[in-house]
């Protein structure tokens, strides 16, 4: 894997996750899908939670844009099982499919990337 995108921050309160998603989608123009990996850990798993109502916070709904990962054929998607447990979330509650892996496995996979972008 060439590029890893690591989402660690919650979706609202700042623009970090939205900017990370924009960077991820832009990277697909320059890299093959197989060269890109996406990871969600800590508060970053909240970016994948279905049924959010950002308009109540006067925020734009960019969360649905994560569904474009299917359209862009980005299949290497991983979510930290420990982080899901922290929020009592199940894979069925996420807007996209992602492989659940433990924190140690996630860190091992991240170490294989040439570049890691953290958001």
Feature locations, PLM:
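Short, conserved beta-strand edge motifs with alternating hydrophobic and charged residues
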Residues: 5-7, 37-41
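Low-complexity intrinsically disordered segments
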Residues: 84, 96-118
């Amino acid at each position: 894997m060439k590029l890893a995108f690591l989402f660690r921050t919650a979706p609202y309160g700042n623009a970090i996750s939205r900017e990370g998603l924009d960077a991820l989608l832009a990277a697909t123009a320059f890299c093959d899908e197989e060269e890109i990996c996406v990871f969600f850990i800590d508060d970053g798993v909240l970016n994948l939670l279905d049924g959010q109502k950002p308009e109540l916070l006067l925020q734009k709904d960019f969360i649905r844009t994560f569904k474009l990962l299917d359209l862009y054929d980005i299949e290497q998607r991983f979510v930290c099982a420990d982080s899901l447990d922290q929020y009592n979330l199940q894979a069925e509650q996420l807007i996209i499919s992602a492989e659940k892996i433990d924190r140690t496995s996630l860190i091992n996979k991240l170490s294989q990337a040439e570049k890691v972008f953290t958001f």
